[in-house]
Amino acid sequence: PPPNPEGTRQARRNRRRRWRERQRQIRSIGAWILSTYLGRSAEPVPLQLPPLERLTLDCEEDCGTSGTQGVGSPQVLVESPAVLEQGTKE
């Protein structure tokens, strides 16, 4: 969580500085884990989604029932590219 906004100006400044340093360290550790163990960069890969017109809900079950039954799962009518394989090195 972000630092507490209480205290003197100097105390707030020090807390913000320490918090930013912790966030920087967390990001660098995450990038190291991604590059070392998963073989990909920490930069986000753009996710390619199909157009909304090609999405449909599979409603073979009763759609009028309550709860999670009958909701169906979104299905893509055309083949989508293998997005997950883009970030791997072979």
Swiss-Prot record:
Primary subcellular site in the record, as a coarse category: host cell
Record-level GO cellular component terms: host cell cytoplasm; host cell nucleolus
One Gene Ontology term of the molecular function aspect: DNA-binding transcription factor activity
Organism: Human immunodeficiency virus type 1 group M subtype B (isolate WMJ22) (HIV-1)
Assembly and oligomerization: Homomultimer; when bound to the RRE. Multimeric assembly is essential for activity and may involve XPO1. Binds to human KPNB1, XPO1, TNPO1, RANBP5 and IPO7.
Entry keywords, A to Z: AIDS, Host cytoplasm, Host nucleus, Host-virus interaction, Methylation, mRNA transport, Phosphoprotein, RNA-binding, Transport
Subcellular location: Host nucleus, Host nucleolus; Host cytoplasm
Motif Nuclear localization signal and RNA-binding (RRE): positions: 8-24
Protein name: Protein Rev
Location of the region described as Disordered in the Swiss-Prot/TrEMBL record: 1-22
Cystine residue pairs: none
The protein's role, per its UniProt record: Escorts unspliced or incompletely spliced viral pre-mRNAs (late transcripts) out of the nucleus of infected cells. These pre-mRNAs carry a recognition sequence called Rev responsive element (RRE) located in the env gene, that is not present in fully spliced viral mRNAs (early transcripts). This function is essential since most viral proteins are translated from unspliced or partially spliced pre-mRNAs which cannot exit the nucleus by the pathway used by fully processed cellular mRNAs. Rev itself is translated from a fully spliced mRNA that readily exits the nucleus.
Nuclear export signal and binding to XPO1 (motif): residue ranges: 47-58
Domain of life: Viruses
